[in-house]
């Protein structure tokens, strides 16, 4: 990354406060943005990082179908960021839930974005998207109780996960070697213990983003991409997909590239690769931002 310097990004709008261009970041389901601090470190050498601390836990932006309100939360946060820093546009970076909501924000309000790098968005595409759409419709029938989406999405597992521990130390011991967390770097996992949990009145700790919100996010994953849009966003965007991600195995990025001409590249790791390889992923993001600037 020695070839990348501040001059590499000089054509981007510059914050009147920090004299750097601005990245707006949005996090994965259940992973508050401060957990990503190891990922932010390299980016912060060149950019000011702004983010929504917690998606899915704000009454003004409830978790609803197709993540419409969460998408609006991204748009509103980006508008506020532009106003704060005196810029017309930001660079958007998102992971998972945050990547998908950011993508939808690109379609909704493209004028606020210069470009985007989206990491492993749950962009369910093609015929599978139609299946999810029908499943969500059927789940609204009496007595269905979200039965179909709990099978199709991670909601069925998430709703049964443990969400209370005696202490942060207890949570660390119980979670560190679990499949979902086992490949996190130590700093990323320590960040989750610090920011992904909060203390209850009785001294125990629970999820900072409630389990009910986490489950609701999975059940309402956007499912209209069998129908629309049939064009790429108006601003440059590239996807980064984990080599072991279920989305790559289901060939969603491949379909998106073929249909919408949105490019993707891969990085070692699974769906949570930005927390498994924060330094190399941040370098990849910087390289993509520079590449997309050069292509304009």
Which ranges hold each PLM region?
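Short glycine-rich catalytic loops that host catalytic nucleophiles or stabilize transition states
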Residues: 52, 264-270
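Conserved serine/cysteine hydrolase catalytic core
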Residues: 186-257
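Active-site loop/oxyanion-hole signature of alpha/beta-hydrolase fold enzymes
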Residues: 50, 54-93, 132-135
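Flexible "cap/lid" loop of the alpha/beta hydrolase fold
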Residues: 116-164, 249
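Catalytic histidine-centered segment of alpha/beta-hydrolase-like enzymes
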Residues: 269-279
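Conserved HGGG/HGGXW glycine-rich cap/lid loop of the alpha/beta-hydrolase fold
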Residues: 13-61
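Conserved hydrolase catalytic core segment
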Residues: 89-135
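A short loop-to-beta-strand scaffold at the N-terminal edge of the catalytic core in hydrolase folds
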Residues: 2-16
